[in-house]
Amino acid sequence: MEILTDVTIPKRKDETHKGDYGRILLIGGNANLGGAIIMAARACVYSGSGLITVATHPTNHAALHSRCPEAMVVDINDTKMLTKLIETSDSILIGPGLGLDFKGNNAMTFLLQNIQPHQNLIIDGDAITIMSKLKVEVPKCQNVVFTPHQMEWERLSGIPIEEQTYERNREAVDQIHSAVVLKQHGTEIYLKDNTYKLEIGTPAMATGGMGDTLSGIITSFIGQFDDFDYAVKTATYVHSYIGEHLS
C-alpha cells in the first residue's frame, strides 16, 4: 500500500466548453435528507463540473435552486425524465440522502436497470446499504466506485470492522471489480492495480455531510479527467487536504 503524499490537478485547455467537463447526474435526497444531495451538488459545482442535474424529492427543489443555482433539478419520481437523464449522462452519483425505504430501493433498482456500459457510476451512503440488502450484482458499466465508511463496507463486503485488514479488503474489492474509497482515519483508496493510503485529514472532518461532499468531488473529477483512477485518488486527496487546512 502506497502513501499518497501529493497530487496534481490537470490544467484545462483553452478551447473547451462546459460539455467537456462532465454531464453529471446526482440521484438522492428524500424529503428528510435533502441537505446531503445539496452538499454533493455544490461539491460538484465547486470542483469544476460542466453540467449538473439533480434528481431529488420535490421538497428539495426550492432549496437546491437557492443554494446551488448552477444545477438543474428534476423530480426523482419522474421515471420518464429520469430515463432520459440516465441515457445522456457521463457519470452518475447515487446515494446521498437517498433513504432506505421502498422509494430509495426503487430509485436504486431503476438506475441499475437503465445504466449503460459506457458510463461511470459512483455509489455512496444509502445506495451502498441498499445494494448490500438487495444483494444485487455490481453493474457492468465503464467504471464503478463505492465510497463507504467502515460500517457500510462491512455491510457490502461482509468483513467486520475489526477485521478490515488490507489483505481482506483487497480480496473483497477484487471480487466486486470496482474501486473503493474506504473512509476512516487514514482513508484507503482501492483501485484496480494500486492501493493508496492517506495520512492527511483531521478529526474535525468527522461531521455530517463530509462524505456527501467527498462523493461530489469524486464524481466531478471523474467527469473531467481522462484517467479514472487518477480522478478518484486526486479527489480523495483534495477533500482531505482541504478539510485539514480549513480546520
Predicted regions and their residues:
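Small-residue (G/A/S/T)-rich helix-start motifs and N-terminal tracts that mark the onset
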Residues: M1-N120, T129-V145, E154-S247
